[in-house]
Amino acid sequence: MQCALYDAGRCRSCQWITQPIPEQLSAKTADLKNLLADFPVEEWCAPVSGPEQGFRNKAKMVVSGSVEKPLLGMLHRDGTPEDLCDCPLYPASFAPVFAALKPFIARAGLTPYNVARKRGELKYILLTESQSDGGMMLRFVLRSETKLAQLRKALPWLQEQLPQLKVITVNIQPVHMAIMEGETEIYLTEQQALAERFNDVPLWVRPQSFFQTNPAVASQLYATARDWVRQLPVKHMWDLFCGVGGFGLHCATPDMQLTGIEIAPEAIACAKQSAAELGLTRLQFQALDSTQFATAQGEVPELVLVNPPRRGIGKPLCDYLSTMAPRFIIYSSCNAQTMAKDVRELPGYRIERVQLFDMFPHTAHYEVLTLLVKQ
């Protein structure tokens, strides 16, 4: 992938950009095989990749510069701002949004937050696009509600310029730290969730719910999990750390009992909405801590699917699964190091199948799906 920002030394986020994709995949596969070298793996499936540019459905832009000439992008370690509107990871549909946002920031008087001086209001712009209908969700992350009335007043102009903006919110993040969002979310549109669709499964994205940033590869990840589950004799499963329900909604059948657990209430609201649309009455989604939920149960289903954050599922949940011994565990991981550590804590299981998903091209990161079977 050619990137003018990288070539000019202005951005180094894509550290592997000079390597062709096949070389990147080989290096990631070698890393994964090295991490799982102590475990016999019955089947290594071919890695899955997607487009090498324009694949991201989300932009997280630090706002800097002045109210008249805002910059959308990032800050270097020395505090120097860098405009990343031309980043080739973003689809072409993002360019007109960025172009309209710059004059809008001036119209609404949203002074960019100055980190060094701890002054200003507008900290971040967060943009998400739906692959199914091109609808977008835009979030303004502000330090306080001081400029909220001004923003509301100027908003009709922006909506006229960008009718694709279906959900618009203000998030209040008052702390002087590099934290992307605060707890308070103020909706400026009637619509509160963005409609998405993977493999004919309706999914919903709300402002404070996690959603994969590479839809082309994520949809293949969910479809693969569905195919693996359909090959197993499973009538009851848990989907732990379930997010908006992507895995569970793909894997569920009308006669399957499924419980999805996720700590974020916003994500659970999305999952429930999807389940209702699909008419799946035996699906239950709850906003709870996944480890606390599981370890409080006296019995387990035939299959437990886990999709934890980078830290992994951790020893307490590993110990519980080892003791309760569900017949199958499907582990989806964005950090193969912690997954390998967790698998070591599950000595009663063998690895039946592993597949790498190149969710993050041009970086060392990748997603991996692993099927563990009780010995």
UniProtKB/Swiss-Prot annotation:
- Superkingdom of source: Bacteria
Catalysed reactions listed for this entry: uridine(747) in 23S rRNA + S-adenosyl-L-methionine = 5-methyluridine(747) in 23S rRNA + S-adenosyl-L-homocysteine + H(+)
Active site, UniProt feature: C334
Q: Which UniProt keywords apply?
A: 4Fe-4S, Iron, Iron-sulfur, Metal-binding, Methyltransferase, rRNA processing, S-adenosyl-L-methionine, Transferase
Concerning Pfam families, the annotation shows: tRNA_U5-meth_tr
Supply the EC number(s). 2.1.1.189
What Gene Ontology terms for biological process does this UniProt record contain?
Answer: rRNA base methylation
UniProt binding sites for S-adenosyl-L-methionine: Q212, F241, E262, N307
Q: Which InterPro entries match?
A: 23SrRNA_MeTrfase_RlmC, MeTrfase_TrmA_AS, MeTrfase_TrmA_CS, SAM-dependent_MTases_sf, U5_MeTrfase_fam
Q: Into which EC class is this enzyme placed? A: transferase
Q: Name one GO molecular function term.
A: iron ion binding
User: Is S-adenosyl-L-methionine given among the entry's keywords?
Assistant: yes
The entry's family comment says: Belongs to the class I-like SAM-binding methyltransferase superfamily. RNA M5U methyltransferase family. RlmC subfamily.
Role, per record: Catalyzes the formation of 5-methyl-uridine at position 747 (m5U747) in 23S rRNA.
What is the name attached to this protein's record?
23S rRNA (uracil(747)-C(5))-methyltransferase RlmC
